[in-house]
Amino acid sequence: MRQPMTTLPRDEWHRTIAVNLTSVYGGCMTAARHIDQGSIINISSGAGTGPVPGSGHYGAAKAGVNSLTWTLSAELAPRIRVNGVMPGAIPTEVMLKALKKSEDQLDELLEEWNIPLGRLGTPQDIGSACVYLASDAASWVSGEILRVGGGAKPK
């Protein structure tokens, strides 16, 4: 729901925070209690790094995910590494609906977002970043939010 904060219904605020932040907290707490060592990877969003008119509630939730990631990386070290992945433009059904775009408008979206690598991302791009963060190759990486967006910066 894209709506200015001043007219956003309170129940929509609570629902968005529950889905996008409280659920991440719950997953992190469950993992922290049940694994002796390893990696937790949270999914963030560029919306959590600055103003997103009409989606302030979502941005607030994702900023909370970033803060949770940084805090847990310190609290769970050295046994568990905690990082985040910040996906860029991935043309999922949910994103297209939120932007009121159709699959026929992907070229328009690519141009609008000015992505230096010249293509929209795929779920596999995000998965590959998560595999890296979970691997031994990232054994000295913790408390980081990895942008995976083809070189584009969140607006």
How does the language model describe each region?
Residues 49, 86-97:
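Short, flexible catalytic-loop segment of classical short-chain dehydrogenase/reductase
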Residues 6, 50-56, 118, 136:
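Active-site loop immediately N-terminal to the catalytic Tyr-X3-Lys motif
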Residues 28, 61:
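Active-site helix of classical SDR
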Residues 3-5, 9-14, 107, 111:
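Substrate-binding pocket helix/loop in short-chain dehydrogenase/reductase
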Residues 50, 130-131, 142-155:
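Short C-terminal tail/terminal secondary-structure segment
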Residues 33, 73-78, 139:
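Alpha-helical segment proximal to the catalytic Tyr-Lys
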Residues 45:
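Residue(s) in the substrate-gating loop at a strand-loop-helix junction
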